[in-house]
Amino acid sequence: MKARGHQEKKSIVLVNDAVTTLIGGKAACPDRQFDSYIGFIWGTGTNTCYMEQTRRITKLGSAADIDGTMLINVESGGYAKAPRGDLDAGFDATTVNPGGYMFEKMISGAYQGGMVRTVLVQAAKEGLFTAETGKRIAALESLSSKEIDDFLFRPYGENALAHCCGGVEEDCQTLYYLIDGLMERAARFVAFNLAAVMPKTGKGANPCRPVCVTMDGSTYYKSKLCKDKLSAYTKSFLNEELGLYCEFIKAENPNLIGAAIAGLLNA
C-alpha cells in the first residue's frame, strides 16, 4: 500500500469467509438464544467455522487458561477421507489441483458440473442411455452447475442436458436420477460435516437452544435439490440418531457485516 502512495498507517484484518459468515449470522439474530454458532459455506467452494473453547486449544499455551472461545476456520473442503469411487478419482485427475480439496470436489458448485459430466459420460458408455443421447452426452465438452439446474427445473426446456436427451422420456428420467443421486450424496456429506463439527462445540443437545448454522453459498440457496435433501438428513441423522439440533439461517450480507465487525473488534 505504501508503494501505491498510501503513507498513513493502517490496521489490516484478514478474515476467512467462513469466519465472517459465522460472525455475520450471530449479529443477525441478537434476540435469539442459540447454544453456539457455525458458519458454513456451500457455494462454489465449501468451508466450515465453529466456536471452540480456548481451554481445549493446547497450542495456545498459557493463553488457553483464559476462559472464552475462539473461532476455528476448519478448511473442511480439504478433508481427504470421505469415501470415493473410481469416477471421483478420474474426475479429480482432470482438475488443476489433483489430490487437493477432495471433499470440496465432491459437494461444491465449482466442481459439480465436471463431476456430473464424468458420471453421465460413464453411464453412456455402459448403455444407460439410447445411442443418440449417449453420443450427445459424450460430445459435451463441459458442464456448469447452472446448466445442471436448468435441466432439473426444466427437463424438457431449452438447455444443454435436455437437448442431449432429445425428448426421449426414459433418457430424461435416467439423467435426472443420476444427478439426483450425486446431489443426495452431497447433502449427506454436508450433514456428516456438521455431525463432525457440532460435537466439537459441545452444544446443540437441547432443541430449544439449537446451534445456529449460518449458511452462505449458491449451491445451498440456488440448487433445486440440495437444500431439501440437507434438511431431510439433518432430521434423520443429526436429530434422530445423534440427538443434535441446529437451525439454518440466512443472514443478509453476512460476509460484509462479519468482516466489518472483525475489523472494528481488532482495530
Where are these predicted regions, by residue range?
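Short, basic and Ser/Thr-rich N-terminal targeting/leader segments
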Residues: 8, 42-44, 209
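Short coil/turn segments at beta-strand junctions that form active-site/ligand-binding loops
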Residues: 10, 34-36, 209-211
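Active-site neighborhood for divalent-cation/phosphate handling
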Residues: 1-27
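Glycine-rich phosphate-binding loop of actin/hexokinase-like ATP-binding domains
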Residues: 20-115, 121, 130, 134, ...
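ATP-binding/phosphotransfer module of carbohydrate and carboxylate kinases, centering on a glycine-rich
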Residues: 2, 27-28, 88-267
